Amino acid sequence: RPPMMLAGMTPTTVDPAIVAAAANGRHWAELAGGGQVTPELLETHIAQLTDMLEPGINAQFNSMFLDPYLWKMQIGGKRLVPKARANVITAGIPEKDEAVALVKELMRDGFPWIAFKPGAIKQVNSVLAIAKEVPELPIIIQIEGGVAGGHHSWEDLDELLIATYGK
């Protein structure tokens, strides 16, 4: 894949058309879960995205752990998100035991990898601890800094990378 990603970010990647365009261009592309606020909207957008993707092409789903309503609807109890190529867990990191159980469950459901989007040194370390518990599944870390006003982080990206890169 080209070295560029269309990361999930509400409101931009709530629309399946931009996600499909990037994915069909062979880029990592994420449908933003933050704007999928009802089961009907989520199902409509997933169906539209599926129709727009070329054969053999897939997209990832960006789920917001911080929002209990969306998390439960999309990933938790109702599990409305079908198999995507990956699930990106953002806006918070579950506790280690909960995260390991979730990763194993998603792996059993056919997700070939899981991504986390930590925005703090402590969160990066948490994701590394989670990854050590599930060596059979690739865990992707998408580190976010706080330059954009702290939406996902208040920490400087350079400091995050310097403090965690060697781990």
Task: Give a label for each model feature.
Residues 1-166:
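Active-site entrance/lid segments in N-terminal catalytic domains of soluble metabolic enzymes
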